[in-house]
Regions:
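Alpha-helical metal-binding/catalytic segments enriched in His/Glu/Asp
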Residues: 54-58
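Extended beta-strand/beta-hairpin segments
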Residues: 1-52, 62-151
Length: 151
């Protein structure tokens, strides 16, 4: 018998003169835009915060899948192409046109384990709908090149 557990998460946002302050539980984040979009660059922009959430959620779920050592040794870069015209109201296309998750692992065995875990990760990752809504999404795995000291 499985029981389903739900949590209700709440964040509070307050627009200030230099960005938006968002409070989640007892944690504060500053969200702002680059000056070219009318901001002061006092924090990452909203899309960067979403990408950070996807990256963190990916590593957390990988750990929850039992791949603790892999999660602790992997690095993940999440990037996206944003349709600024859509955000500004001048275009009807997808807001996020492309999203890419680039995993870097230490060796071939880790790469094989990660590739096997990716379908399970996609089913459980919070924010997967954001990835699925992008016009194009890719998730790749590569092995880090190890360098020796002095190179």
């Amino acid at each position: 018998v499985t029981t389903s557990r739900r949590e209700h998460l709440v964040v509070h946002a307050l627009l200030g003169s230099h960005g938006t302050t968002v409070t989640a539980r007892r944690h504060e984040l500053t969200i702002d835009e680059a000056p070219r979009y009318g901001g002061h660059d006092s924090g990452a922009n909203p899309v960067e915060h979403m990408l950070a959430g996807l990256a963190a959620a990916s590593l957390v779920v990988l750990r929850l899948l039992g791949e603790v050592a892999l999660a602790e040794s992997a690095t993940l870069t999440v990037s996206a192409s944003v349709n600024v015209g859509r955000v500004m109201g001048t275009d009807d296309g997808a807001a996020i046109e492309m999203i890419r998750l680039d995993w870097h692992v230490a060796n071939a065995e880790h790469a094989e384990r990660l590739r096997a875990a990716l379908p399970h990760l996609a089913r459980r990752r919070p924010g997967q709908a954001l990835i699925d809504a992008a016009s194009i999404s890719t998730e790749g795995v590569s092995i880090r090149e190890l360098t020796t000291a002095g190179e």
